Structures are given as structure tokens and as C-alpha cells.
Regions:
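Short alpha-helix capping/helix-loop boundary micro-motifs
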Residues: 81-86
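Hot-dog-fold acyl-thioester-processing enzymes
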Residues: 1-78
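Short, low-complexity, polar/charged sequence segments that are solvent-exposed and flexible
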Residues: 31-34, 42, 78-79, 117-121, ...
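HotDog/MaoC-like acyl-thioester-processing domains
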Residues: 1-2, 89-141
Length: 141
């Protein structure tokens, strides 16, 4: 059984202002806390801009692929996230890493449902950016 197995921790991924700005453009979310360095530094609570929470969530599939290789997959579906809790904000120029532990694996008539306990680590911080149970559906060839 794979339940409870810590699959691994991804390599560190730098979140810079360019990535934050591109995400702001893609999602039409240009709040100053994300995009205005001067205002965020002078008036914001974090002394810098911060990444959008949804930007950090959208990195899960990329970071997961750095940890686990699932072979013979025809299609992988990001099915959802349960019990999501945001912790610390991710400041610009921070490095993040995904820690993944298998919570469950179920075969649903040919589709495999995998739930991982995901924790987004921030380099130099003791608390994560978030934790949650990420659900992937795999359709195999």
C-alpha cells in the first residue's frame, strides 16, 4: 500500500516578479500587493510584493512532476483540492518546494484517483505557504 508514503520533495522553484506579473495579466488580478513593488514595500504588511495564492496553487502539477513519474498516462486531470489552508504568503524572489505524501490511491473502473497531502514549503520559513489534499485522476493507455 502506498498510503502514508512521503513521495518526495521537489527542487526549489524561484517565484520572481516577472512570474507574478504574468500571472496577474493572465488572471486580470493586478492588486498592488502583487504588482506594485514600491507601494507594497512602503505600505504593505510584508515589505515586498507577494505571489497570488492561486499562482502558488497552479504550480502543483509542475512541482508534482518533479517528484513523481507516472508512466503510461493518457491523460492526467487536476480534479480538486480538499482541506486547503493558506499559511504564510510567498514573498517575491522566494523559493518554494512541494512536499508530497500519498494519502490514497483508488482504481475507479480504469481511472486511478490519487490524493496527495501537499505542503508548499518556503525556503527559510518554518511554516508552509499552504497545505491541502490534492486530487489527481489518471487515465492510462
Amino acid at each position: 500500500s502506498l498510503e502514508g508514503v512521503m513521495v518526495g520533495i521537489s527542487p526549489w522553484h524561484l517565484i520572481d516578479q516577472d512570474q507574478i506579473n504574468l500571472f496577474a495579466d493572465a488572471t486580470l488580478d493586478h492588486q498592488w500587493i502583487h504588482t506594485d513593488h514600491r507601494k507594497a514595500t512602503d505600505e504593505g504588511p510584508y515589505n515586498s510584493t507577494i505571489a497570488h495564492g492561486y499562482l502558488t496553487l497552479s504550480l502543483i502539477p509542475y512541482l508534482w512532476k518533479q517528484i513523481a513519474e507516472v508512466r503510461n498516462v493518457n491523460m492526467e486531470i487536476n480534479y480538486g483540492i480538499e482541506n486547503l489552508k493558506f499559511g504564510l504568503p510567498v514573498k517575491v524572489n522566494s523559493k518554494v518546494s512541494l512536499q508530497a505524501t500519498i494519502k490514497s490511491v483508488n482504481n475507479l473502473r480504469g481511472t486511478v484517483k490519487v490524493i496527495i497531502e501537499a505542503k508548499l514549503l518556503i525556503e527559510g520559513e518554518s511554516k508552509p505557504a499552504y497545505t491541502g489534499d490534492v486530487i489527481f485522476l489518471y487515465h492510462f493507455k
